[in-house]
């Protein structure tokens, strides 16, 4: 069927031998495989206790935890770990440390439930917020260089949607940070720890698909080594997906170009659902024309949004929280200002973020990164003039449905929480759901470390290091190779870039900050046609080695899967909740729509099911927060 090299992994030495064998293969198989000839692809087999896909914050934290528990762990990543998108996170990580004032994780939980517009699962939110202080102290012990107060404590800044005493005690200072480069500091710290614990990295390996057996158990993944064109089957007792979001489905996004929803699409192709994809966060302050992120921490340090008339307009929309209202509230308010003619610039299509009233030492010490970013991408000296900003796609609240252990779940019969054996997910790829319909700023870095760690702990509960694995089925990975071969030999008339641009325009125009039945129905029709056009894609490079044309085309298919499910899920949800704002259904409808959307991918068609929100907490340490009007 195909040439196969088996690489045992009972020792570190055998894996390095396998890497040597793999590095030599291109000498003997330099000609690319013929179209349709699966036997000409060379497969290298690996066996591990656990495999992590993705080396951002969630993937690295999972890998560290697995290694700490003694598991032989592989981490597959399509780019070098410290180039993962976690590096772009700026503002910080939330935890009720109480360094700036009295704080309580229950207050943090309340803010997160409220921020989620009551679509978040309260058991998972309780777990995350309760674990937050421990997670941050652990990062400090790992060596993360947090900013400090004068007395040496971790400095914490104000962030949107954060309060004291369940919303009645004023603004909370809960966001621990390393200036405005917290993600950079976090990622490098975790990578150092992963190296210390001897995690085996497979860098520049593009994960193609999950390896699922006939009883629905995940047994690993199959991946393409971009360096030499070989295919690799990673057989593992546990597979953890930490592949990030799919922001690049939109035309303007703060996401890196590598954020293509690969793990989501792998899950969808395996016949499993994706949850709540209609909830896409628009960050209020992307630089106009560039989309680069200006952290919410800029407003946390005292930055002010103004319209073309110089008015602090957020005072009208959120009289209490003002510029630090929840992100969906601020983004909608900004969009309304522009619609009503109070935008700035020749086209009146952006607003201003003022920082020039802040002391220069604050900008230098607390916001050095965005000061530099504004100078490069907007030509602005933040000490003298405002930054032109516009809401920009930033985060996907939806993703692969999981419980608070990180185990992937699906709808099976009458069980809405059926666990998929052997498969876990963490980070932006996952939907635990701790963010619900809207994520609070600085809860994302918390999410990745808490649930990356949770995945590792759960593996340790259900699996033993060195445990014998059930053999792979004979055809394991065959469909993935057929998929790869089909795309590599695509000979249509449309370049990948044109189809991608069409998709991005449809998503930007039809699934934006405000939505209507008309725009969403049109969006469903257009995105379906865009998917159909993918059948006419042309891949000009047939090689297997460093073939960026091939990789981008596979990433495009992954994006299209996410985009189609997003659009159809949004069209179906007849209410406004969090980031899903309908102009024709302006109210939240708890009676009919307090439920999670499950989108299934069926050969180009989207099928929707639903599962209930978890309203019960884990224990009696905190009571359930019942739904109420969401006001800031």
From Swiss-Prot:
GO molecular function, one term: succinate dehydrogenase (quinone) activity
CC annotations in GO: mitochondrial inner membrane; mitochondrion; respiratory chain complex II (succinate dehydrogenase)
EC code(s) of this entry: 1.3.5.1
Residue positions of the active site: 327
Entry membrane topology: Peripheral membrane protein
Keyword Oxidoreductase attributed: yes
InterPro entries reported for this sequence: FAD-dep_OxRdtase_2_FAD-bd, FAD/NAD-bd_sf, FRD_SDH_FAD_BS, Fum_R/Succ_DH_flav-like_C_sf, Fum_Rdtase/Succ_DH_flav-like_C, SdhA/FrdA/AprA, Succ_DH/fumarate_Rdtase_cat_sf, Succ_DH_flav_su_fwd
Subunit structure: Component of complex II composed of eight subunits in plants: four classical SDH subunits SDH1, SDH2, SDH3 and SDH4 (a flavoprotein (FP), an iron-sulfur protein (IP), and a cytochrome b composed of a large and a small subunit.), as well as four subunits unknown in mitochondria from bacteria and heterotrophic eukaryotes.
The name this protein goes by in its record: Succinate dehydrogenase [ubiquinone] flavoprotein subunit 2, mitochondrial
Upper lineage: Eukaryota, Viridiplantae, Streptophyta, Embryophyta, Tracheophyta
Record gene name: SDH1-2
